[in-house]
Design a protein with these regions (language model features):
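N-terminal structured subdomain of primase-like DNA metabolism proteins
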Residues: 1-80
Length: 80
């Protein structure tokens, strides 16, 4: 199993988002950190995120890579 597969199977997007400071509401929505967002427009679930405002989308590795300006490999290492 690769590092990417391991991270994606063991760490949920919701958990990572909350761990890194995003405030996710009861319906899995939060304010998108990738654009100025006054109201929650990013939907998160266990496996992916999607912003209805700016179109940002991806899995847990993509989320952490974008949050911290990392490569996918660096984000996977940070999550491992």
């Amino acid at each position: 199993m690769t590092l990417f597969e391991l991270v994606k199977q063991t760490i949920q997007v919701l958990d990572a988002a909350e761990h890194y400071g995003l405030q996710v509401n009861h319906s899995g929505m939060c304010r998108c950190p990738f654009h100025e967002d006054r109201h929650p427009s990013m939907k998160l679930n266990e496996r992916y995120f999607y912003c209805f405002g700016c179109g940002a989308t991806g899995d847990v590795i993509d989320l952490v890579a974008r949050l911290f300006g990392l490569s996918s490999f660096e984000a996977a290492q940070k999550l491992a």
